[in-house]
Swiss-Prot record:
UniProt cross-references to CDD domains, sorted A to Z: SUMT
Molecular function via GO: NAD binding; precorrin-2 dehydrogenase activity; sirohydrochlorin ferrochelatase activity; uroporphyrin-III C-methyltransferase activity
Domain of life: Bacteria
Name by which UniProt lists this protein: Siroheme synthase
Amino acid sequence: MDHLPIFCQLRDRDCLIVGGGDVAERKARLLLDAGARLTVNALAFIPQFTAWADAGMLTLVEGPFDESLLDTCWLAIAATDDDALNQRVSEAAESRRIFCNVVDAPKAASFIMPSIIDRSPLMVAVSSGGTSPVLARLLREKLESLLPLHLGQVAKYAGQLRGRVKQQFATMGERRRFWEKLFVNDRLAQSLANNDQKAITETTEQLINEPLDHRGEVVLVGAGPGDAGLLTLKGLQQIQQADVVVYDRLVSDDIMNLVRRDADRVFVGKRAGYHCVPQEEINQILLREAQKGKRVVRLKGGDPFIFGRGGEELETLCNAGIPFSVVPGITAASGCSAYSGIPLTHRDYAQSVRLITGHLKTGGELDWENLAAEKQTLVFYMGLNQAATIQQKLIEYGMPGEMPVAIVENGTAVTQRVIDGTLTQLGELAQQMNSPSLIIIGRVVGLRDKLNWFSNH
């Protein structure tokens, strides 16, 4: 993050604009809207500045720039067509520790001004960090079309209710659930837009007096295979509404950065053969947090119902009467194969695909004879440590040694690495890779050279 987004309280505070043209006028409108006590300095002014001065809205200082104009200022803007003058204003402000914006010169400025969507008191600011103002403007226009004009009225009304809501609901969780109900209530929003006081009062009383469900809930969310762009929209909504997020090591930092900032985060870092927190304890964490009335998200890499032990966790919740739901995710097999240019099925090479755990525990022998058959694709999850055994067993049961194989490490991430070869090389290839990795075996791997789009980017 190159810039910290902040909202400045400028009401009745001295601000300076140097420049008297059209660009300076646009900046002046923003400062006047914010209630600043504005002084504008220039050699000449367009008529709008004169009109504002005549109305007593700002002060004009005609003539060359004088650094003393900054002495009482909180904030300054250099908006002339003279680069040297703009630089001088910026340096003078910097020496006084005053924030200064230099129009069209972000590197010379100590702050930049975003594109603004104004639904006062709700404000949305969009910035490209000064690199692409046109892109920021296009995004602002798109957001303008998505945010109803009456949104500001809803926000203002919520401010009026805050005291009563704080008295009515004892805990932060109860208040948040109330506000969520209020903000998605279409009838209230329409009544505010129409200024229908009777309907506003009726709807508000109904929402406040409606009993809240004090039970917590758990949502099992699949985070996908790594790339944050592959997180589903519903998954994103759930992690941004969560009070607690319980996650493991397969969830990327990019996805965790999307979690609501004030949510509690509980790391239970699981990987093959090692559990930072035992599965039974994870089950109890979910149960314990939900019993406190919290909204809990269990965030798992890939899909929670494919080798994620999601079913075991939900059984514990079900037995305790805790409400739960599941948001599927893109499983590693689908994501890793797509980002490696390997179609899992193909008319000529594979009519089926098998997803297999590589945890070859004692007493859990796989059906190697069927796995060695042609016209299918095998995908081994967590199979890196057992690659030599997988190679030996498949060859023993008749799979040709020249069968194409690939191992995908950190699939779909920018650090993705893929190596391929033949089945006779699988054990050796696995020694070159690190976890998390996925093993893909089948004729479809031979299409990788032609279809490998991701690494070519």
